[in-house]
Amino acid sequence: MLWYCEFYKVENIKITEGAFFLDILKFMQHLKLSVVPDSTGMVGFNPGPKTHDGLYFEKQSDEEGNKTLNLMMRMANRLIGEGMRTTVSDLEKDWHEDMIWWGPGGIGASYTYDGYLKGHTGPFEENLEFVEFSGHVLENSEGNFGGWFGWPNLKMRPKGNYMGLTQNTDLIGEMRVVDLYRRDKNKIAENWILIDHLHFLKCIGIDLLERNRKLKD
């Protein structure tokens, strides 16, 4: 299954810009290609919102949309301020305890605070050094849903065995990230994430597509 996300800018009833993200690494995992390491989270199908209300056909309340955007930005600013490090006390401020984190290829999905710390933030913090937050191209919300993307959002330097791929280098990798959120009352309930891991890994000298090609030759 090929997971993707699209963003478009419309001016004068025509599309003027677009951004298209493909989670090729997740696709490679579904194909069980040997060059892709095991994930620390669950690898499978990432569904839509469990509330089944992700499609809006009518204008939503600006007030509700602003609540969602403010929550997203509060959480992000706290995370960036902590150098991309997360604790349970941090999560308690912005996330429901039964949060679902639908992670990208290479990481996988996590459930609850403990699952999130074990499946994502623990390995992420242990094996990557935060270098720079590069900002977002778009931050937007409507009703209980919102999201952003960057090109890139983050710059990180490997310092260990990130995603099972050891790389001793001073090279800095760019992370192009999509984050989509569902707010439930005053906290985040679900989060869908895409990371262009193939681009990040290539920045630090790891070309998984080339490795896979060589295995087939």
Give the label of every model feature segment.
Residues 1-217:
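C-terminal and inter-domain tail/linker signature
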